[in-house]
């Protein structure tokens, strides 16, 4: 106990304040994450901090002090210590882990690579002209392994070439030429390692989602849930309107088929009875013209006229279509004729 007290007394005050500050930031935000800042210039970090000010707080501290702060907070928070490696910063926000990931990805920008650095991916120089006039630059490009020549008064890359494969060391000559060609192989920004949210730890792989696909999946799931609820007659605020409309249509159909005399179906019953009546009367009149009276004969005549008018409608449309086609053919013929005259007279 004495040894622990003695050790605590020798911790500098600024370290205690730093640990307290980290703990307060974690406790005052819903979410915090660890990001790698290795290779990022101080000026770039300052710019990122300004860009994030409306969404998140970025704090750079010593790994040892961050570790102490996490350990003192307890619960599952100390599990974040395994993501402390090399140069690390903390980021605090009240947004969701997914929003934080998206915002941090937007901080990444292409950056030149230095000589002696490892290529993160294949570095490719594309075929095509450059902005350089003929001069010493031609030999410099060639000595760096870039196939260059003179074309139309400009230095040009003769063919597309992989000048450095992923994992290989980039030479100083090549690094210089890549920068001159404005080829920036590095993507520099805050590299999210993990996010802590209410006891759960999310790694980048879980947060990198395709938003359009995600939205499509949710929409499809919502539609399937709606259909299931309607087909199982499960009432909710979203389905009650459809369920009532479906129930009304089914009850009306039942009333008509069962011939239930109700104010809600009387119009449909009368219309159905009228159709049945004219059908029977028509068959009777076909067998014996005197089987129907004058009034019923007028009804049958009106029905026959209406049916004939409906049957003629498609014929009229067909005639109009044929006339339009003939007019188009005439127009084309005139155009062809004019074109022919044009060719004759140059």
UniProtKB/Swiss-Prot annotation:
Region described as Disordered: 307-346
Residue ranges, compositional bias (Acidic residues): 321-337
CDD domains reported for this sequence: Ribosomal_P0_L10e
GO cellular component, one term: cytosolic large ribosomal subunit
Gene3D superfamilies: 3.30.70.1730, 3.90.105.20, 6.10.140.760
Function (record text): Forms part of the ribosomal stalk, playing a central role in the interaction of the ribosome with GTP-bound translation factors.
Family designation: Belongs to the universal ribosomal protein uL10 family.
InterPro entries named among the record's database cross-references: Ribosomal_protein_uL10, Ribosomal_uL10, Ribosomal_uL10-like_insert, Ribosomal_uL10-like_insert_sf, Ribosomal_uL10-like_sf, Ribosomal_uL10_arc
Gene: rpl10
Domain of life: Archaea
Keywords associated with the record: Ribonucleoprotein, Ribosomal protein, RNA-binding, rRNA-binding
Any one Gene Ontology molecular-function term assigned to this protein's record: structural constituent of ribosome
GO BP term, pick one: cytoplasmic translation
Protein name according to UniProt: Large ribosomal subunit protein uL10
Organism: Methanosarcina barkeri (strain Fusaro / DSM 804)
